[in-house]
Curated annotation (Swiss-Prot):
Its main location: cytoplasm. This is Intracellular heme transport protein HutX. Homodimer. Interacts with HutZ. Keywords: Cytoplasm, Heme, Iron, Metal-binding. InterPro entries: Heme_Transport_Util_sf, HutX-like. GO terms for cellular component: cytoplasm. It is found in: Cytoplasm. Gene3D superfamilies: HemS/ChuS/ChuX like domains. The keyword Ribonucleoprotein does not apply. It comes from the Bacteria.
Length: 193
C-alpha cells in the first residue's frame, strides 16, 4: 500500500521537475527573444514587445537584461509608494483601453483605509484609490525612452498586466533629476541583492 503512494510521490516530483525545467527553458527563450528585440529595435517599449511576442508586459520586463531591471514582490508596493512623495515631480502613467493618461506632479502621500491605498494629492496632483492587493510585482526598470535615459517603477497584476507606471521626473531642460536617478539606482541595486 505504501509503495504505491511512494511511487505516486516519485512520479509527481518528476513531473514537477519537468514542468520547472520547461518553464526555465521558456524563460530562457523569452530572454533571448527580448535581447534580440532590444538589439534590433532599441526604442521599442516593453508593452510593444509584449504585443509582438504575444506575452504579457510583465513577462517582457522580467526577461529584460539584469542590468535593466529589478523585480520585487508586490508586498513592497506600499513601501515604495510611501517613499515617493519626497522625490519631487514624477510622471504617473496609466494606459486604459489604448488611451494614455499622464499626471506630471509630485506623487501624493497616501494612507490605507477601507481596503485601498488612498492618494491624497493637492489640486493638480494625482488623486485615487489603489487596490494594492492586486499588485503582484513591482519592477524598477531602466530603459531608454525616445533615445533618452529613463527609469520607472512598473506596478503589475498577477495576470502580468501593467496597472500603472511612475517615471522619474525631468527638469525644465527635459533632463532627469540627478537626485531621483541616484535614489532610484540605489533602490534598484538594493532589490537585486
Amino acid at each position: 500500500m505504501y509503495s504505491g503512494a511512494y511511487s505516486f510521490v516519485q512520479i509527481s516530483t518528476a513531473a514537477y521537475r519537468i514542468s520547472i525545467t520547461r518553464l526555465e527553458k521558456t524563460m530562457e527563450s523569452l530572454q533571448q527573444q527580448v535581447a534580440q528585440l532590444l538589439e534590433q529595435q532599441p526604442t521599442l517599449l516593453p508593452a510593444a514587445m509584449a504585443e509582438q511576442l504575444n506575452v504579457t508586459e510583465f513577462d517582457i520586463v522580467h526577461a529584460l537584461p539584469e542590468e535593466m531591471v529589478a523585480v520585487v514582490d508586490g508586498s513592497h508596493a506600499q513601501t515604495i509608494l510611501e517613499s515617493l512623495p519626497e522625490w519631487g515631480p514624477v510622471t504617473t502613467i496609466m494606459t486604459i483601453a489604448g488611451s494614455i493618461f499622464e499626471v506630471k506632479a509630485p506623487f501624493p502621500k497616501g494612507k490605507v483605509a477601507r481596503g485601498y491605498y488612498n492618494l491624497m494629492g493637492r489640486d493638480g496632483e494625482l488623486h485615487g484609490h489603489l487596490k494594492l492587493e492586486n499588485i503582484s510585482h513591482v519592477a524598477l526598470v531602466s530603459k531608454p525612452f525616445m533615445g533618452r535615459e529613463s527609469h520607472y517603477f512598473g506596478f503589475f497584476t498577477a495576470q502580468g498586466e501593467n496597472a500603472f507606471k511612475i517615471y522619474l521626473g525631468r527638469d525644465e531642460k527635459r533632463e532627469l533629476i540627478p537626485e531621483q536617478v541616484a535614489r532610484f539606482k540605489a533602490m534598484q541595486q538594493q532589490h537585486k541583492q
